[in-house]
Swiss-Prot record:
It holds the Pfam family GATase. The lineage of its organism: Eukaryota, Metazoa, Chordata, Craniata, Vertebrata. Involved in the urea cycle of ureotelic animals where the enzyme plays an important role in removing excess ammonia from the cell. Primarily in the liver and small intestine. N-acetyl-L-glutamate binds at T1391, T1394, W1410, N1437, N1440, N1449. The modification Phosphoserine is found at S148, S189, S537, S540, S569, S896, S898, S1036, S1079, S1090, S1093, S1203, S1419, S1431. It is found in: Mitochondrion; Nucleus, Nucleolus; Cell membrane. This is Carbamoyl-phosphate synthase [ammonia], mitochondrial. Glycans are attached at S537, S1331, T1332. The gene is Cps1. The modification N6-succinyllysine is found at residues 55, 57, 119, 157, 207, 214, 287, 307, 400, 402, 412, 458, 522, 527, 553, 560, 575, 603, 612, 751, 757, 793, 831, 875, 889, 892, 915, 919, 1074, 1100, 1149, 1168, 1183, 1232, 1269, 1291, 1356, 1360, 1444, 1471, 1479, 1486. Keywords: Acetylation, Allosteric enzyme, ATP-binding, Cell membrane, Glycoprotein, Ligase, Membrane, Mitochondrion, Nucleotide-binding, Nucleus, Phosphoprotein, Repeat, Transit peptide, Urea cycle.
Length: 1500
């Protein structure tokens, strides 16, 4: 809501509606806008007053006249123009639950259709007595709009106010029943009026008989009880000549083929003349069909002898589920009625439909005559068109003759399913996290396991992602067996042989699981072992994944897709592009996250992108580019009974051309009309039905911004990133529901777990909105452009919840990175815009920083039309963004003395943080907080209940907003707060979600109440049933303090969520928060690298020579004294941000500048880099300075590779016992010195028996899940008990004195990289972390474990040739490796000098040309050609800084990645690979539990 920023529109509406001189109750507005003079405008206030005494203040945007009526609410997400003109609202003051109204303005209210009916309205004008909304869009945008909503309301003299907590109002009506109310302006007192005592039907009915569709063959008499225009349209469309008669017209003697009664408002029992006329028809011999709609249902029932009653709160909205009693099929319906028939029907009549939620009557039918009626609105407008088929049924009755009933003409359900009988189900996970396939599948897989357990189905989970919650082996919500194995057809087949499941779920493991399942189907494995694919069939999956099949399927139902050709060669791709015309879009089959896709403006780009795409797949789609169109997504659920619901629709703020995973996304869609919304919804359901999807799927549309033209982009027949977002945005647990559906359970029988009362067969209503913003880490990848497009690049995302776009948008921006204050022109991480910035180019070429470029353009007074032209972003979003910057300017003109409570409150309502405000007012954040609280401005806690408060909810799913007037919940539990990890990014991924979930579960097992704060929709920790209270909120000092104090928490755990919460330790502590575990003062000493190094010196714990430096001269002086290379490290960072090995003075200058930018408040530490050392990790739990649990793992790679990118071995393989004892001794000293109570991690360098400390983190590390699962001891469980002061049984813990060292198996943790997505990035490892995920596997020895782990990362073991590229210094060490590879039968290729050296040492090698020298020597083959034709299927490239072929080596590495072949760039990993290939002839399918069982058997 932008109250302070909307004065221009207020002026317009005030001038057009009434004179300013009449305003009595006034509110001062401050307003400034570029190009517009400063205005001082007074906005009129009014109150909504209820008969129970409730009084709420609001601000007028309609006609300034008091009015009385019955206050009702509508939870619909769209179609306010249609709703306002619905005659059923006559005499009622309508409360819209949708928090933002007026986005699309008002259409042409004078336009008429071919029947002479108002084209965009459901009657001849607005019928509501008044309108109440939370937030009104003064600035509107839609291609059909001709004026603002406020202007239209004033023209029709209808009062409307905004600024009302509509959720609070809805709850009052819900709990107390519909009640009388009034909108009162000062000086215009009115009495309460009960419209139900009036015959409202008479007021809205036509006064004359009117005929529509004259000359049509079927005569239908339509009795107007407040009939909607769309009823008439639908009748005429089907060939009716409609005779519209007044409500009291005697139609009993009229000649007709069918009789329809439709409407309307008020108490139907008051329409006695109509009831008597219908009674005559029912009791006569006339058997022409009768169809009653809404009031027509009650009128028909009353005429038949049934009774009606006034409902306590009415059914008004667009998501009411009804069940056809005759065939058990469910439909989503639009409803608007306050009266209903009771369930005792007279003889000869029976119910036809029933409400799934409240079991009220929704329709009746005669048992022998063609009479039927429904309580809902099959003509909708606004709302879903699911039951429009009833008009067809009505006409079928007319055509069939007079002696039949409605059941004979209703369409038969497409499917009648039965429960799928399975006893054991195999669930395929997605493997390690990668760009495009991240933590959302941990969430969805965990939900699927939970659903199976609820239904007493045994589950076998196959997933090598050691860091995921779903791969826990112990717990009530865990699978019965877990296999840490590669998700490949070979290994899945072995698991099927061993476990003999009778069911298989493919939809919870992303593209990995889907592709694997398709291959198993094609190979006949599933048929051979009698495994049923649950949910969507493989044939349907193939129809969505194969681009040609998909196109053919859509053509079968005449659905719109972009003109396209599926091709299998570059030659055909070029021909297709010529036929379609450039620009074209290419898409790969069976690909994830837009991999292998891109926009090709010309032939050269198509050649480049197409060649890379064909390296990954055998088929691509070449299609017309719809860049610049709107991108809209729907999440659709369909059960085996053909019941369909659309759970969520989402709108990409970024237009087509940017992958949805890289787009800013809002839910629900904000700029669609009801016609657009329902058109795409209807299409979604039609497509999903035709494709045979059973479960959940995502469908993406391109919608033309100024017409109704659309095309379908793709369908994902599985849970996806968007599914996880939709689940968290709505509270509807999509994965859980999809898993139940896969067992054949129909939707109406599944409970809505959020409300605890309603069915899962419904479409959620939102009285808030969410904004998703991606998190990129492109700066980490050298050579990668910040430009984004159709291939996804983001590594994570956040979701923010608010009740205005501005609020959720600014929250989301801050959630993405702690350095961001909100929507500002400043770049994240304190970066500066380049001096030669081309702002127009920044806007026209989407990038990871374009949102800040938009802010900069607005700051520079660029016009909105120009920004729209450059970005194709809908102007409505830009209006809102401009409003934020206008508030920023307003605040900058004030100070702590002059800023008013009103202005401060308005800033908070549009998402300004205290920190943001403090920078405008010249205060500190603490001073701003103090000022705000002094003015009694505080946030409100609201629930996400899936129903917009329509039903009471048991949900604990919460968010915080300044747009409200009451809390939804009580604060009487005083739980322990646990801070989650925030957005996934490089260095902080699913492993920290595992830590948080483990801690939460331990607390709950101990009987402690938990309060969780996190903002990542991909996580299990943000699953509302994991904790007692879930706040989907910012991990900022301000918001944590808000929640902590409001909840009166008993303490806060910050050490299980990674670096973001850890960085809050000291600020929270200084603000009085009780930090559980290690003291924040000790955390501060450890995080500050300078202080930590000094402490180690005091403890006489060995470390490499170091120095804290503040200037370049200090750094150069130190480096010259100890010699290069040196390691440069900033403080308080995660995953090696700005950490670099420095080899020269030039590098020192460059890297030091970067390090000081990311860590401005703390000194940078320089350390002598120790070459040739092995890195060792110590993961441990301390208790009051004593180590009570520990695990030591070893890196395969030598030091210099970030620990997050390293391959870990547990137990250690090459470290001497003497060195291990030194590691333990140093750990003891550190634990004692820092009085550690909780989790911590220490990293060591080991060279021979020398042991040096690298760093210590007084929090959980990313290797905690790995060591916990490997050793069978949950380190976080232990740490949590320590932190809250619970006793810990140390007898079975791996203490320093009695370690647990596996003897029968070895665990290998391997990193997952996403190099193919990061176009032009150099795929080589450095100090700064680059991996996006991890996997772990187990084997009897290191070699089998290593090969399993490598295969789990997608590594393909070569079958033909290996290209070797090594620098001269590597040769002596590499010769043995080369001999091993040659002996294993691989053909070796090498550049000329290396080839000569290998041949001279009796290792045959074929010489090849460097890429830059291709063609110079005809006898030397091209590396790129050999790779692309498959002669080379592994590249070993071991460069150093001394080579003169730096660029050539980069080209070779990049070619390997772009061609989808294996690449090794580390000598130690290459050496282990060669050994593994030689020694591990076969790789078994055993997993951790097999080895544990063997160990237990030996022990017994």
């Amino acid at each position: 809501m932008t109250r302070i920023l909307t004065a221009c529109k207020v002026v317009k509406t005030l001038k057009s509606g009434f004179g300013l001189a009449n305003v009595t109750s006034k509110r001062q507005w401050d307003f400034s806008r570029p190009g517009i003079r400063l205005l001082s405008v007074k906005a009129q206030t009014a109150h909504i007053v209820l008969e129970d005494g409730t009084k709420m203040k609001g601000y007028s945007f309609g006609h300034p006249s008091s009015v009385a009526g019955e206050v009702v609410f509508n939870t619909g997400l769209g179609g306010y123009s249609e709703a306002l003109t619905d005659p059923a609202y006559k005499g009622q003051i309508l409360t819209m639950a949708n928090p933002i109204i007026g986005n699309g303005g008002a259409p042409d209210t004078t336009a008429r259709d071919e029947l002479g009916l108002n084209k965009y309205m459901e009657s001849d004008g607005i019928k509501v007595a008044g309108l109440l909304v939370l937030n009104y869009s003064h600035d509107y945008n839609h291609w059909l709009a001709t004026k603002s909503l406020g202007q239209w309301l004033q023209e029709e003299k209808v009062p409307a106010i905004y600024g009302v907590d509509t959720r609070m109002l809805t709850k009052i009506i819900r709990d107390k029943g519909t009640m009388l109310g009034k909108i009162e302006f000062e000086g215009q007192s009115v009495d309460f009026v009960d419209p139900n005592k009036q015959n409202l039907i008479a007021e809205v009915s036509t006064k004359d008989v009117k005929v529509f569709g004259k000359g049509n063959p079927t005569k239908v008499v339509a009795v107007d009880c407040g009939i909607k225009n769309n009823v008439i349209r639908l009748l005429v469309k089907r060939g009716a000549e409609v005779h519209l008669v007044p409500w009291n017209h005697d139609f009993t003697q009229m000649d007709y083929d069918g009789l329809l009664i439709a409407g309307g408002p008020g108490n139907p029992a008051l329409a006695q003349p109509l009831i008597q006329n219908v009674k005559k028809i029912l009791e006569s011999d006339r058997k022409e069909p009768l169809f009653g709609i809404s009031t027509g249902n009650i009128i028909t029932g009353l005429a038949a002898g049934a009774k009606s009653y006034k409902m306590s709160m009415a059914n008004r909205g667009q998501n009411q589920p009804v069940l056809n009693i005759t065939n058990r099929q469910a439909f989503i319906t639009a409803q608007n009625h306050g009266y209903a028939l009771d369930n005792t029907l007279p003889a000869g009549w029976k119910p036809l439909f029933v409400n799934v939620n409240d079991q009220t009557n929704e329709g009746i039918m005669h048992e022998s005559k063609p009479f039927f009626a429904v309580q809902f609105h099959p003509e909708v407008s606004p709302g879903p068109t699911d039951t429009e088929y009833l008009f067809d049924s009505f006409f079928s009755l007319i055509k069939k003759g007079k002696g039949t009933t409605i059941t004979s003409v209703l369409p038969k359900p497409a499917l009648v399913a039965s429960r799928v009988e399975v006893s054991k189900v195999l669930i395929l996970g997605s493997g390690g996290l990668s760009i495009g396939q991240a933590g959302e599948f941990d969430y969805s897989g965990s939900q699927a396991v939970k659903a199976m357990k609820e239904e007493n189905v045994k589950t076998v989970l196959m997933n090598p992602n050691i860091a995921s919650v779903q791969t826990n082996e112990v717990g009530l919500k865990q699978a019965d067996a877990v296999y840490f194995l590669p998700i490949t057809p070979q290994f899945v087949t072995e698991v099927i042989k061993a476990e003999r499941p009778d069911g298989l779920i493919l939809g919870m493991g992303g593209q990995t699981a889907l592709n694997c399942g398709v291959e198993l189907f094609k190979r006949g494995v599933l048929k051979e072992y009698g495994v049923k694919v649950l949910g969507t069939s493989v044939e349907s999956i193939m129809a969505t994944e194969d681009r040609q099949l998909f196109s053919d399927k859509l053509n079968e139902i005449n659905e719109k897709i972009a003109p396209s050709f599926a091709v299998e060669s570059m030659e055909d791709a070029l021909k297709a592009a010529d036929t379609i015309g450039y620009p074209v879009m290419i898409r790969s089959a069976y690909a994830l996250g837009g991999l292998g896709s891109g926009i090709c403006p010309n032939k050269e780009t198509l050649m480049d992108l197409g060649t890379k795409a064909f390296a990954m797949t055998n088929q691509i789609l070449v299609e017309r580019s719809v860049t610049g169109w709107k991108e809209i997504e729907y999440e659709v659920v369909r059960d085996a009974d053909d019941n369909c619901v659309t759970v969520c629709n989402m709108e990409n703020v970024d237009a087509m051309g940017v992958h949805t995973g890289d787009s800013v996304v809002v839910a629900p869609a904000q700029t669609l009309s009801n016609a657009e919304f329902q058109m795409l919804r209807r299409t979604s359901i039609n497509v999903v039905r035709h494709l045979g999807i059973v479960g959940e799927c995502n469908i993406q549309f391109a919608l033309h911004p100024t017409s109704m033209e659309y095309c379908i982009i793709e369908v994902n027949a599985r849970l996806s990133r968007s599914s996880a977002l939709a689940s968290k945005a709505t509270g509807y647990p999509l994965a859980f529901i999809a898993a139940k559906i896969a067992l054949g359970i129909p939707l109406p029988e599944i409970k809505n777990v959020v409300s605890g009362k309603t069915s899962a067969c419904f479409e959620p209503s939102l009285d808030y909105m969410v904004t998703k913003i991606p998190r990129w880490d492109l700066d980490r990848f050298h050579g990668t452009s910040s430009r984004i497009g159709s291939s996804m690049k983001s590594v994570g995302e956040v979701m923010a919840i608010g009740r205005t776009f501005e609020e959720s948008f600014q929250k989301a921006l801050r959630m993405c990175h702690p350095s961001v204050d909100g929507f500002t022109p400043r770049l994240p991480m304190n970066k500066e815009w380049p001096a030669n910035l081309d702002l127009r180019k920044e806007l026209s070429e989407p990038s990871s920083t374009r949102i800040y470029a938009i802010a900069k353009a607005l700051e520079n007074n660029m016009s909105l039309d120009e920004i729209v032209k450059l970005t194709s972003i809908d102007k409505w979003f830009l209006y809102k963004m401009r409003d934020i910057l206008n508030m920023d300017k307003t605040l900058k003109g004030l100070n702590s003395e002059s800023v008013t409570e009103e202005t401060l409150r308005q800033a908070k309502e549009i998402g300004f943080s205290d920190k943001q405000i403090s920078k405008c007012l010249g205060l500190t954040e603490a001073q701003t907080r103090e000022l705000r609280l002094k003015k009694n401005i505080h946030p409100w806690v609201k629930q996400i209940d899936t129903l917009a408060a329509e039903y009471p909810s048991v949900t604990n799913y919460l968010y915080v907003t300044y747009n409200g007037q009451e809390h939804d919940i009580k604060f009487d539990e005083h739980g322990i707060m646990v801070l989650g990890c925030g957005p996934y990014h490089i260095g902080s991924s699913v492993e920290f979600d595992w830590c948080a979930v483990s801690s939460i579960r331990t607390l709950r097992q101990l009987g402690k109440k938990t309060v969780v704060v996190n903002c990542n929709p991909e996580t299990v920790s943000t699953d509302f049933d994991e904790c007692d209270k879930l706040y989907f909120e910012e991990l900022s000092l301000e918001r944590i303090l808000d929640i902590y104090h409001q909840e009166a928490c008993n303490g806060c755990i910050i050490s299980v969520g990674g670096q973001i919460p850890n960085n809050l330790a000291v600020p929270l502590y200084k603000n009085g928060v009780k930090i559980m575990g290690t003291s924040p003062l000790q955390i501060d000493r450890a995080e500050d690298r300078s202080i930590f190094s000094a402490v180690l010196d005091e403890l006489k714990v060995a470390q490499a020579p170091w120095k804290a430096v503040n200037t370049l001269n200090e750094a150069l002086e130190f480096a010259n004294s100890v010699g290069y290379p040196c390691l440069l490290r900033p403080s308080y960072v995660l995953s090696g941000s700005a950490m670099n090995v420095v080899f020269s003075e030039d590098e020192m200058k460059r890297f030091l500048e970067e390090a000081t930018r990311v860590s401005q408040e703390h000194p940078v530490v320089l350390t002598k880099f120790i070459e040739g050392a092995r890195e060792v990790e110590m993961d441990a739990v301390g208790k009051e300075g004593r180590v009570i649990s520990h695990a030591i793992s070893e890196h395969v790679e030598d030091a210099g590779v970030h620990s997050g990118d390293a391959t870990l071995m547990l137990p250690t393989q090459t470290i001497s016992q003497g060195a291990i004892e030194k590691v333990k001794d140093a750990t003891r000293k550190i634990a004692k010195a820092f009085a550690i109570s909780g989790p911590f991690n220490v990293q060591f360098l080991v060279k021979g028996n020398d042991v040096l400390v690298i760093e210590c983190n007084l929090r959980a590390s990313r290797s905690f899940p790995f060591v916990s699962k490997t050793l069978g001891v949950d380190f976080i469980d232990v740490a949590t008990k320590v932190m809250i002061g619970e006793s810990v049984d140390e007898k079975h813990l791996p203490t320093l004195e009695q370690p647990i060292i596996p003897s029968d198996y070895v665990a290998i943790k391997a990193p997952m990289f996403s190099w193919p997505r990061l176009r032009d990035a150099d795929p080589i490892l450095r100090c700064e972390m680059a991996s996006t995920g991890e996997v772990a596997c187990f084997g009897e020895g290191i070699h089998t474990a290593f090969l399993k782990a490598m295969l789990s990362t997608g590594f393909k073991i070569p079958q033909k040739g290996i290209l070797i590229g090594i620098q001269q210094s590597f040769r002596p060490r590499f010769l043995g490796v080369a001999e091993q590879l040659h002996n294993e039968g691989f053909k070796l290729f090498a550049t000329e000098a290396t080839s000569d050296w290998l041949n001279a040492n009796n290792v045959p090698a074929t010489p090849v040309a460097w890429p830059s020298q291709e063609g110079q020597n005809p006898s030397l083959s091209s590396i790129r050609k050999l790779i692309r034709d498959g002669s080379i299927d592994l590249v070993i490239n071991l460069p150093n800084n001394n080579t003169k072929f730096v660029h050539d080596n980069y080209v070779i590495r990049r070619t390997a990645v772009d061609s989808g072949i294996a690449l090794l760039t580390n000598f130690q990993v290459t050496k282990l690979f060669a050994e593994a290939v030689q020694k591990a002839r076969t790789v078994d399918s055993k997993s951790l539990f097999h080895y544990r069982q063997y160990s237990a058997g030996k022990a017994a």
